[in-house]
Amino acid sequence: MKLVMLLVVVSAMLVLGGAQTASQFYCGDFLARTMSSLCWSDMQKRSGSQYAGYGWPWLPPFSSSRGKRGIVDECCYRPCTIDVLMSYCDN
């Protein structure tokens, strides 16, 4: 009986604890909006000259990204966590 109760408690802790770090798919506009909200504290609508010449910090230049895993490989094709997304923010 004690073993069953211990297994129930451990299972509940794993389920509740895992909900905070659950993996999710991030693709397209959802990925862009999520990265904007994670990397910049106040998400603002882009207006022409305000962001002129300002690139997306989590996307490497096309020429250097060949053959390497990027954010789409990690979070769109497979589920990833918020911690993985935040690792792409330019700190």
From Swiss-Prot:
Pfam families: Insulin (PF00049). It comes from Bombyx mori. The gene is BBXC1. This is Bombyxin C-1. Residues 1-19 form the signal peptide. GO terms for cellular component: extracellular space. Disulfide bonds join 27-76, 39-89, 75-80. Silk worm has two kinds of PTTH: 4K-PTTH and 22K-PTTH; there are many forms of 4K-PTTH. It is found in: Secreted. SMART domains: IlGF (SM00078). The keyword Signal applies. InterPro entries: Bombyxin (IPR017097), Insulin-like (IPR016179), Insulin-like_sf (IPR036438), Insulin_CS (IPR022353), Insulin_family (IPR022352). Residues 47-67 form a propeptide.
